[in-house]
Structure formats: C-alpha cells, structure tokens
A protein has these predicted regions:
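Structured, non-membrane catalytic/scaffold regions adjacent to prosthetic-group chemistry
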Residues: 53-260
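N-terminal twin-arginine translocation
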Residues: 27-36, 44-63
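N-terminal secretory signal peptides
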Residues: 1-29, 33, 43-44
C-alpha cells in the first residue's frame, strides 16, 4: 500500500461496483447542495463573469471557490474549541443508518482476522489487530453527528482519542494530512489539526455496545467538528502524508475541509 490512496474511484472490484452504482444519486445530492447554496444562474453569471453554458469555465470557478472555502475554514478552525456535548439521555440508541448502498451491501468483516494497516509518515507501521485496539484506554463522548443531507442525531461514541493513537504509532504530528481507506472502497482524509482535536476518536462502540456492522464495525472515525461524510466507517488503513490525498466525495465536488 502506498503512502496515499488513488484519487480514482474505489479499487476493490465488488465494493467499487457498489459505490459506482451510486454515481447518479451522488450527482443528485451535489445538485441539491448547489441549489441550497443559493447560486442561481443569474447570480453565478454575475459572480463569475462567465457564460454559465460554458460548463468547464463554471466548474473552474466553482473549484476555486471550494478551495478558497477550504482555506478559510482551516484558518478559522480552533483546535481547542470543543463541540457541544449532551447528557446520555439525549443519545439516540437506534442511530440512523446512512450510506450510498443498502444494508445488504454492508462490508462483512471478520473481527478475528481484521488488521488495521499503517503507512506513510509513521515510525511504527506494524498492523493492529482488533484486540490491540480494544486494549487501548478508551473514552466516551455524547456529541451531535451532522449530515450534509440536512439531518443530525446525537449519539454516544466510545473509542480511542485519535491523538493518543497517532502518538502511540509514532506518527509525524507536523505532517499535513491523515488519510483513511475503508472496506467498502471509500477513502477520506483530514487535516492534522483536526486529527489532533480532543474530540476526534477512533470509535469502537456506540451506545456502550460494540459497533454493529451498519455503524462501521470494527472501526469508525468520529469527528464531530466535521460533516458526516468525513466520519469514515469500516476503516482498514490509516496513513500520514504531506501530499494532499483527496477524498472520495471531495474528488467529486464536495468541500474538503467540511467543518461544522
């Protein structure tokens, strides 16, 4: 496995087909997001000075706006500001399932043979078993998960603070990015400042129970400072890099920083 994943669609054939079948749905979500942002044809023409029928010119402008938005969010991100926490009584036990495929296509992962692979700017790259992860000190948080589709839910998440894990494996904490690869072919990445935020967890449990497959068993990233698509499930690999790694939906037009 290289230091960074490909920015092409997921590479595992079965999982690739599952995600590629969702491309039409993804384009529809992107269209809705664009409309929600309130950029009418007239407003876009006025803003860009472009003929909006020139799709390449418009896309170039939108890409530039997205990059500017990412930079602006990174500049105002406060790594010491905590997201609100809630009483356990407000945590939803039957948390909503959300993915771009049905529950019959959820990856089937054998916990006994599971390995978390590490690569990139990391001193100790030996793979971790699930039992290795369970033996690490764990903490819990009750925070709100915010989806880009417009819904949110409060959940109780238990796992290992990601900062603790990165320190344990000897990751270069001055590097720019941390990336994730998942059993369903999904891939994601976050900035190092967000990775080190005290509420960013490698999650092993939800509502005090081992993650069910639909919630990302055996390992999910919980990062309440970002939108839901930045919380990858079914994680099988983590890497640290200074090269921008991209991410699945962001490579298709979503904002990369995606702060809440």
């Amino acid at each position: 496995m290289g230091e960074t994943p490909s920015t092409n669609p997921p590479r595992n054939s079965g999982e690739s087909r599952a995600l590629l079948r969702t491309s039409a749905a993804a384009r529809e979500i992107e269209r809705r997001l664009f409309l929600k942002q309130g950029l009418s044809v007239g407003a876009l023409t006025l803003l860009t000075g472009c003929d909006v029928t020139d799709t390449s010119a418009v896309q170039s402008v939108l890409d530039g706006i997205s990059r500017w938005n990412d930079r602006a969010q990174a500049l105002i991100f406060n790594p010491r500001r905590l997201m609100p926490t809630y009483p356990e009584s407000q945590a939803v036990k039957d948390f909503r399932y959300n993915a771009y495929f049905g529950q019959n296509q959820i990856p089937k992962i054998d916990g006994a043979s599971y390995k978390l692979n590490l690569s990139g700017l990391i001193d100790r790259r030996a793979a971790w078993t699930l039992q290795d992860l369970y033996q690490l000190p764990q903490e819990s948080q009750v925070t709100r998960h915010v989806c880009v589709e417009g819904w949110s839910m409060i959940g109780k998440w238990t796992g290992v603070p990601f900062r603790t894990f990165l320190q344990r494996i000897g990751a270069d904490l001055t590097a720019k990015y941390v990336g994730f690869e998942c059993a369903d072919g999904y891939y994601s990445s976050i900035d190092m400042a967000s990775a080190l935020h005290p509420q960013t967890f490698l999650t092993l449990k939800i509502s005090d129970e081992i993650l069910a497959p639909r919630y990302g068993y055996p390992l999910k990233l919980r990062i309440p400072t970002k939108l839901g698509f930045k919380n990858p499930k079914w994680i099988t690999a983590i890497f640290v890099t200074n090269r921008f790694p991209g991410a699945f939906w962001e490579d298709r037009g979503y904002n990369w920083f995606a702060g809440v």
